[in-house]
Amino acid sequence: MDFDQLTTFVYVAKLKSFSRAGQKVFRSQSAVSAQIRQLEQAYRAKLLDRSAKSVELTPAGEVLFDYAERLLRLRDESVQLVADRGNVVQGPVVFGANEATCLYLLPDIFAEFQRKYPQVHISIYRNFSHKILQRVEDGSVDVGIVTLPLKSPNLKVHHIYKDRMRFMVSSKNPLASRNEVTLEEVAGQPLIFPRTGFTRQVLDKLFRPYRSRVHVAMELPSIGMIKRFVGADAGVSFISESFAKDQVKAGEVKLLSVDGVDLFRELGLVYRRDRSLPRAAQALIGLIREHKNLSGSPDPA
């Protein structure tokens, strides 16, 4: 058993195909089959079921798959950590964040990071916070930014950002002449909600007492779309203050306070406690922590 065989096995399991796995590892289908046979002989067990239309893991194969992924990650980590003993910060970093964080909070930080460490390659995994947490915990993502709070004894968490959520209306909306409204007034407006995610959960809870009269006019998949539709006066919404700076400056929308309502979105930087991170990942963590609270809001921790 060697790393090449394990790599081939992992690709076959993921792609459910010998031929497609062969393309990934630059081997013929017969060579891939030979490597799998050698693994099955070494473990004295059938690892893959080839009888179905696609290749499936057997129970023994599922056990080996988990170990194979861990072994390959440990190999990559060890190679990187040995390389890190030199003076140059280099190598890959896999970073996880949701779309809004990638669009509105990270570009300036990542641009500065690339200027400082041009030999580091950053790969971004974009998804919801719970998916990012899963990837950080299984080791396939080095560092992530997720919505707080969270409870995980396996993760180190640094609070880095706190942003107030405000009520957003078009500059054409009559409410734009005001600085503050009541929640009852908001409930009477055509609401635009995000389809899923943290903000949707917060808004569903906020408007629960007004359920009988709330009119959710639209559910949209991204913050960018919500801003455009609110700007066109197709409805109203709530948004993190920093995500609408450009639209407020351009006069397209106005952000209002809601009497008696204080909503915040908090973000944390997360990585595994038990993992030795490469210097490139450590450098990125350090830079992000230097830039914490760019919104100017107080740090509660």
PLM regions with names:
Residues 18, 40-59:
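A short LG(V/I)-centered, amphipathic sequence patch enriched
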Residues 42-43, 64-86, 295:
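Alpha-helical linker/hinge and terminal dimerization helices associated
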Residues 88-153, 211, 220:
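Central regulatory/effector-binding core of bacterial HTH transcription factors
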Residues 105, 171, 254-298:
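A late-sequence structural motif
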Residues 128-141, 146-147, 198-255:
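Hydrophobic hinge/microswitch elements
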Residues 152-191:
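Flexible hinge/capping segments at coil-to-helix
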Residues 189-210, 277-286, 292-299:
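Secondary-structure junction motif
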